[in-house]
Amino acid sequence: KRQFVRMAMIFQACRNSSAAFLKIQSDAGNGVQENAFLHNKYINYLITELKPVTGEIIRQGAADGLIVCQQPDALAEIVLLVLVVKLDNTLIPSTKEETEQTISELISLLEKGTDNPEGSLNFLKL
């Protein structure tokens, strides 16, 4: 189950870094174009840096028989895209409830798609 602890840490890192980046960006007073450029670089960096780590966690979980996954890196990218976009909340602005619903459905999809029992990935909830 250490894979789930590591995944929870990545989720927390996404949440914390998104909040910190948005605060810094709002305080910086940059122009719209510069903010968009920096935001794009930030999202790219976050996904690029976390994808190998997340993929390795998924591979380890599959090797340990905890999950079923044929393409760990693809699954890692899907998870990170949803988490980063929803937690960032600027590309597709959403209410807290909408974000919670999306994350809940991602959890349900992941549990079913990786043969994990219902509720086993609830640590991802906001």
Predicted segments with their positions:
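Short, hydrophobic secondary-structure boundary micro-motifs
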Residues: 22-27, 70, 119-123
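Short secondary-structure transition hinges
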Residues: 16-66
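C-terminal peripheral helix-coil segments that are non-catalytic and often amphipathic
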Residues: 52, 56-63, 89-126
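Short alpha-helix boundary/capping elements
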Residues: 12-16, 83-87, 114
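All-alpha amphipathic helical-bundle segments outside canonical DNA-binding/catalytic cores
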Residues: 5, 45-46, 59-78, 97-101
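Amphipathic alpha-helical core segments of compact helical bundles
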Residues: 47, 51, 80-84, 88, ...
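Hydrophobic alpha-helical connector segments
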Residues: 1-27, 76-79
